[in-house]
């Protein structure tokens, strides 16, 4: 599925990749969201918008760690988004690729993403689309807040769990505690990757002229 959101229009759903050129004005701000498309269609679309072949190759791979690349003034990044969440930090991650150009944000993912859906349904979306970097920040910020919310909820659960184990702990309790620790380590590893990416994005845009609002959102992501 390919969704196209331009500043002055509602979402357009494209079933035929060949229609993209006639529907998208490349001179106007635009967000193209690609979900669960074939590799052939993804590659064809990205190349038609001038995305670097190395980045196209990476975005089609599965289970790569988060990364950031600067390709001739545009950026490419891989990110671990949130697909779904079950109780006690049982998070299903979704690999997401982003291409950011002057007037364009392209997002690629195989499954629905919390950050994408949050941005798509936000009343300020048309404002954000004017600046692709701002839209990217909003998507990442929604994911980060969801991560934080889930961790805080687990913190409360762990506090009660530790009190219980201190009184009487069973083998099942220890197994559950080990599972919690494993999930937290995985999240810590992903968070470290994401922090490095945000630092690289800040460095990239520090060399360019940004308005105060965009700078604020970048710094806010890092914090």
Please give the residue ranges for each predicted region.
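Divalent-cation
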Residues: 1-126, 130
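Extended amphipathic alpha-helical scaffolding segments in membrane-proximal extra-membrane regions
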Residues: 80-223
């Amino acid at each position: 599925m390919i969704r196209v959101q331009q500043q002055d229009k509602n979402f357009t759903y494209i079933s035929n990749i060949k229609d993209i050129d006639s529907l998208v004005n490349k001179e106007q701000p635009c967000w193209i969201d690609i979900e669960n498309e074939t590799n052939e269609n993804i590659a064809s679309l990205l190349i038609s918008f001038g995305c670097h072949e190395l980045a196209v190759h990476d975005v089609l791979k599965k289970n790569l760690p988060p990364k950031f690349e600067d390709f001739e003034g545009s950026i490419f990044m891989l990110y671990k988004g949130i697909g779904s969440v079950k109780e006690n930090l049982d998070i299903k991650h979704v690999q997401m690729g982003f291409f950011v150009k002057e007037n364009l944000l392209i997002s690629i993912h195989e499954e629905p993403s919390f950050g994408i859906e949050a941005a798509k349904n936000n009343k300020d979306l048309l404002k954000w689309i004017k600046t692709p970097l701002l839209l990217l920040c909003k998507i990442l910020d929604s994911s980060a807040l969801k991560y934080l919310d889930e961790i805080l909820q687990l913190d409360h659960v762990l506090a009660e769990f530790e009190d219980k184990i201190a009184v009487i702990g069973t083998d099942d309790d220890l197994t559950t505690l080990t599972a919690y620790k494993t999930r937290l380590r995985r999240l810590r590893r992903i968070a470290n990757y994401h922090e490095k990416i945000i630092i690289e994005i800040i460095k990239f845009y520090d060399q360019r002229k940004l308005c105060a609002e965009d700078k604020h959102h970048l710094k806010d992501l890092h914090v």
